[in-house]
Amino acid sequence: MDCIKMNRVEQMKMVQGTALELFTRKNADYGDAFAKYGVIGVLMRIEDKIQRSLSITKNGVNLVSDEGIRDTLLDLHNYAAMALMLIDEE
């Protein structure tokens, strides 16, 4: 895949498609567990992921070997969407 030759809209569609696949898999495993603590709970998970991404990029430290920066950013994408879903339900 040569993302440089794609326009940004196509790139966004690919990122969102990948994130949706990830959300679908995790939602099958965890259900709506993210809703248990509401928006605040999701924001706390976002903070965890931000700290993780900073650790990976600034220090080169990746304690979870099967989750790199791309995986962490996809999780951030999904957590932001989950927070929006909860806000929309209010």
List each model region and its residues.
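Intrinsically disordered, low-complexity regulatory regions
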Residues: 1-90
